[in-house]
Amino acid sequence: MVDTSEITTLLFDWDGTVVDSAGVGLTAFERSFAALGVPFDHDLYREAYSPNWYSVYEALGLPKEKWQQADDLWVHHYGELNVEPIAGALETIAELKRRNYRLGVVSSGTECRVLREIEQLALKDSFEIVICNEQMKQKKPHPEGLQSALSALGCTRKVTAYVGDSPEDIEMGQRANMLTVGVRSDYPTSWKLKNHNPDILIESLGELLHYF
């Protein structure tokens, strides 16, 4: 079993890790591409999915001049839909707080959306730091977001773990030289997690409590 005794801080990806947004996100993509008059290839989406939307747009053949419009449409359509927490997420986060872990979020999602969902789920007091797309010049898997969180919290990588559901999350944590936890989700690339060798691989977020 991995030694987690030095870990005092847990940073979480948001989509697919804390909130069950895979289906909602896909619907938002479908509606956005339809509004732009661009065919949406589900097979290509599954193969190319990444927290970096622009790599998805590129793989799906969306012209670069439409990327910003696609972003705006996605946020609009996503906002029309309801997002629920991952099963057991709220209870797990509450228990980690009770165990005195410092918690934060590092997400590729837009700040307005992630903060809104944190508020809706009554998690505002649970997270000391929230880093979103707007605060990261370099996107996942570049470690900038994690480095910014460490700096804001005044802690080191040696006492920090990053929890995420995508290969990019694991690579991001590895490039930041911190302990990584992969958690399965319904996102298309989640099955690739094992190939990226996270320090801990779990099937559900609740399993974190076996390690921390």
Region spans (language model):
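Acidic, Mg2+-coordinating phosphoryl-transfer loop and its flanking beta/alpha structural elements
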Residues: 161-200
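Active-site neighborhood of HAD-like aspartate-dependent phosphohydrolases
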Residues: 2-46
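Conserved Lys-Pro-Asp/Glu-containing loop-to-beta segment of HAD-superfamily phosphomonoesterases
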Residues: 9, 139-170
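Conserved H-loop
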Residues: 39, 63, 124-128, 156, ...
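A short, structured active-site edge motif that brings together acidic residues
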Residues: 44-45, 49, 123-139
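A metal-dependent, Asp-based hydrolase signature
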Residues: 35-36, 47-78, 87-95
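Structural recognition of alpha->loop->beta junctions
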Residues: 122-132, 192-212
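Short, acidic loop-to-helix structural element flanking the phosphoryl-transfer center
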Residues: 79-105, 111-115, 143
